[in-house]
């Protein structure tokens, strides 16, 4: 039976400001991309998420980002590569301590937001993120976009790369994501998103906004926990994938 992992961004609240229903999403996904305090998240909240993930057997991933709480890590920052190495090392280390205190561990690393999109093509920042992961633990897989410069740099350093697809994001014809600033970048119809996920897994292709069929490889599918109707979307995606004969399990 083919398998696919489901991942979602969690732990992105800050104090009394909560974003999404982390507990509910942990009942659906198999991998949790947990914020590390730079783009979102605060220690007590991250501890709660990691504890809940550990109790449910959900893998914990360090979701590293730019130091940009005000912009939620969705703004490009022209950070010096050496500084970026240090900041990514810091974030992984912080979440690793929290995860270990809950009887779990950081199992992989996934960049967040603008950093994720930037290192698809930005060689210096891609190399910095890959080097930071290698410095912390060269056995940690990195989750990202197939064909990216980041994956090239990670492979050169001997890191395992795990390709993901986005069930609820629109794609350009070059295989990159449509910017969130553009209309239609984030999809909202749960049934259509679920069918799209099944089609991507079965065909290895995704339909871009211009109608182009873009080849895509994936071991994991991302469902966003902060979108309107996130729970309905994630549930529909999991149910449709399972009904189509796919086993839902973590990639690591």
Swiss-Prot record:
Recorded catalytic reaction(s): these are: 5-oxo-L-proline + ATP + 2 H2O = L-glutamate + ADP + phosphate + H(+)
Q: Highest taxon of the source? A: Bacteria
Please provide the Gene Ontology terms (biological process) for this protein. carbohydrate metabolic process
Q: What is its EC number?
A: 3.5.2.9
According to the UniProt entry, its GO molecular function terms are:
5-oxoprolinase (ATP-hydrolyzing) activity; ATP binding
Which InterPro entries does the entry link to? Answer: Glyco_hydro/deAcase_b/a-brl (IPR011330), LamB/YcsF/PxpA-like (IPR005501)
Annotated keywords: ATP-binding, Hydrolase, Nucleotide-binding
- Locate the transmembrane regions by residue number: none
Listed under subunit, the entry gives: Forms a complex composed of PxpA, PxpB and PxpC.
Function summary: Catalyzes the cleavage of 5-oxoproline to form L-glutamate coupled to the hydrolysis of ATP to ADP and inorganic phosphate.
Recorded family membership? Belongs to the LamB/PxpA family.
Please identify the protein, giving its name as recorded: 5-oxoprolinase subunit A
Species of origin reads Mycobacterium ulcerans (strain Agy99)
Designated gene of the protein: pxpA
């Amino acid at each position: 039976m083919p398998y696919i992992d489901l991942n979602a961004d969690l732990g992105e609240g800050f104090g009394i400001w909560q974003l999404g229903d982390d507990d509910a999403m942990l009942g659906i996904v198999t991998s949790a991309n947990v914020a590390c305090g730079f783009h979102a998240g605060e220690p007590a909240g991250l501890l709660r998420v990691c504890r809940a993930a550990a109790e449910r057997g959900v893998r914990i991933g360090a979701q590293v980002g730019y130091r940009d709480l005000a912009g939620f890590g969705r703004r490009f920052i022209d950070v010096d590569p050496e500084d970026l190495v240090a900041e990514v090392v810091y974030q992984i280390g912080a979440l690793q301590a929290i995860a270990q205190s809950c009887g779990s561990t950081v199992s992989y690393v996934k960049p967040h937001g603008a950093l994720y999109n930037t290192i698809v093509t930005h060689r210096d920042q891609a190399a910095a993120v890959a080097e930071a992961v290698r410095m912390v633990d060269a056995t940690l897989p990195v989750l990202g976009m197939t064909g990216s410069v980041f994956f090239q740099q990670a492979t050169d350093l001997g890191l395992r790369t795990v390709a993901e697809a986005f069930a609820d994001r629109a794609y350009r014809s070059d295989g990159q994501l449509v910017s969130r600033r553009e209309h239609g970048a984030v999809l909202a119809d749960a049934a259509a998103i679920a069918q799209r996920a099944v089609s991507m897994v079965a065909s290895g292709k995704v339909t871009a906004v211009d109608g182009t069929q873009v080849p895509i490889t994936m071991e994991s599918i991302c469902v966003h926990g902060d979108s309107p109707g996130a729970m309905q979307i994630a549930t529909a995606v999991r149910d449709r994938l399972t009904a189509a004969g796919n086993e839902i399990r973590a990639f690591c």
